[in-house]
UniProtKB/Swiss-Prot annotation:
It is found in: Cytoplasm. GO terms for cellular component: cytoplasm. The gene is prmA. It comes from the Bacteria. Its main location: cytoplasm. One of its GO terms (molecular function) is protein-lysine N-methyltransferase activity. It catalyses: L-lysyl-[protein] + 3 S-adenosyl-L-methionine = N(6),N(6),N(6)-trimethyl-L-lysyl-[protein] + 3 S-adenosyl-L-homocysteine + 3 H(+). This is Ribosomal protein L11 methyltransferase. Keywords: Cytoplasm, Methyltransferase, S-adenosyl-L-methionine, Transferase.
Length: 312
């Protein structure tokens, strides 16, 4: 079977929005080529083990390539013109850079290779290493491994917003904590919380593809007894209180449910929130404080911010 590779050249700021557009028009997986990510991974003691320096030549010298793979079937031209229209609409809201779209035809075998070749085992925090399900990997004795196949859900674990969240969870979680993960995607944050000592984790997502992916990943990692994955719209209908409320969703979505997050956080508990682009930091911080939280810490990676807010 022939597949088409669609490549959009964009900015780091617009990666998630462009990835979403590609998913919406029917892409079967997205590959992100960002030279800054590549250089960071190379610098983090995996040099030569996992990343091959010659791969760097395939990355754009500036900006980011978001690549997606779709069957080269009859309605491909409609899909492409829809995508281009949506990219132009996005341009009115966000700095998307050139937004240039290029197309290449590839064989299925190459597609499988292209989709997975950049997704390798990555140590994402002191204790946790994410390993793609299809990779053979022998962990070090102190390494705690999360096996992941995100499929079409967001959450390879290696996006800065996810890494910030997992590092904060590792820092603040206490043995026996009860955790809720809003917008679980592949389930990566919930699995991390379970592996780091949570007594229970409730994982919610609006998207049925994410719910299915999270359920599979939870089972693969043997934490099905601890993590309950359900469909849910933010914290609507959720009752009870949690030691940790975690959410890696865009700032504009976080702003919608800060008050609900406060209500669902135990006294002395924390709301760990990520997915906040730098320019939205003040707005989210102010809204957290207005809801009654104290800002305990703000972590930054590239253009992204995670805020750890405490309920006194
Ligand atoms: C940026 S991804 C984060 C995935 C994963 N938690 C991680 O950290 O990598 C955001 C997720 O939030 C979900 N989402 C968006 N709006 C939502 C809503 N209103 N209620 C629940 N989930 C939502 C999306 O479907 C997506 O899976």
């Amino acid at each position: 079977m022939k597949w088409s590779e669609i490549c959009v050249h964009t900015t780091q700021l617009a990666v998630e929005a462009v990835s979403n557009l590609l998913h919406e028009v029917g892409a079967q997986g997205v590959v992100i080529e960002d030279v800054e990510d590549f250089d960071r991974m190379m610098a983090e003691d995996h040099f030569g083990e996992i990343w091959d320096v010659s791969d760097r030549e395939t990355y754009p010298t500036s900006g980011v390539h978001v690549k997606a793979y779709v069957p080269a079937s009859g309605d491909f031209q409609d899909l492409l013109s829809n995508l281009k229209k949506e990219i132009e609409r996005l341009r009115t809201m966000l700095d998307i850079g050139s937004g240039d779209v290029t197309v290449a035809e590839i064989d299925e075998e190459d597609w499988a290779h292209s989709w997975k070749q950049y997704y390798k085992p990555v140590k994402i925090s002191q204790q946790l290493t994410i390993v793609p399900l299809w990779e053979e990997y022998t962990p070090q004795p102190e390494e705690n491994v999360i096996l992941l196949d995100p499929g079409m859900a967001f959450g390879t674990g290696t996006h800065p917003t996810t890494m910030l969240c997992i590092q904060a969870i590792e820092n603040y979680i206490r043995e026996g904590d009860h955790v809720i993960d809003v917008g679980t995607g592949s389930g990566v944050l919930s699995i991390a919380a379970a592996k780091l000592g949570a007594a229970s984790v409730k994982a919610l997502d609006l998207d049925s593809v994410a719910v299915e992916s999270a359920r599979q990943n939870v089972e693969t990692n043997g934490v099905g007894e601890l993590v309950q994955v359900d469909t849910g719209d933010l914290l609507k209908g959720v009752e009870g209180e949690y030691d940790l409320v975690v959410a890696n969703i865009l700032a504009d979505v976080i702003l919608l449910f800060i008050e609900d997050a406060y209500a669902r956080t135990k006294s002395g508990g924390r709301f760990i929130t990520s997915g906040i682009i730098g320019e939205k930091r003040a707005e989210v911080t102010n809204a957290l404080v207005a809801a009654g939280f104290e800002i305990e810490e703000t972590r930054v990676m590239e253009d992204w911010v995670a805020i750890i807010a405490k309920k006194g």
